[in-house]
Design a protein with these regions (language model features):
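Charged, amphipathic alpha-helical segments and their flanking helix caps
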Residues: 1-22, 40-119
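A short, hydrophobic beta-strand-centered structural micro-motif
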Residues: 32-41
Length: 119
């Protein structure tokens, strides 16, 4: 782990989320794809110099509410499973995805937060 674990975790999560088949980014690209996962680091804590707990909000956009919830559920499952095999992320916890409409777009969004243990 380097001095800034948030910088390390985004590439690791992007790799873990590749099987979703949708773009994974920290920004919403222009033009916006029909389906998208955005990762937003939201902080965390560090118990020791070698251990950190990093929080990331995961937002999944899709054309329908059901598709957004399904994409978020898939992302959640991949993150929880990926923590078992990733070199950086050694444990993951995640809230359940919830629908969270995006009034600025015609897309539908579901979101959840994950806490990652990084050694």
């Amino acid at each position: 782990m380097n001095d800034e674990p948030l910088g390390d975790v985004i590439p690791a999560l992007t790799r873990i989320l590749t099987p979703t088949g949708v773009p994974v980014s920290t920004i919403v690209p222009n033009p916006r794809p029909k389906s998208l996962i955005r990762l937003t680091p939201t902080g965390g804590s560090s118990d020791h110099t070698w251990l950190a707990h990093v929080m990331v909000t995961v937002e999944a956009w899709a054309p329908t509410p059901a598709a957004a919830r399904a994409l978020a559920a898939q992302a959640r499952g991949l993150i929880l499973a990926g923590a078992e095999t990733d070199d950086l992320i050694h444990d993951a916890e995640a809230t359940w995805p919830v629908a969270y409409d995006d009034p600025e777009t015609p897309s539908h969004r579901a979101t959840f937060t994950t806490t990652l243990t990084i050694i």
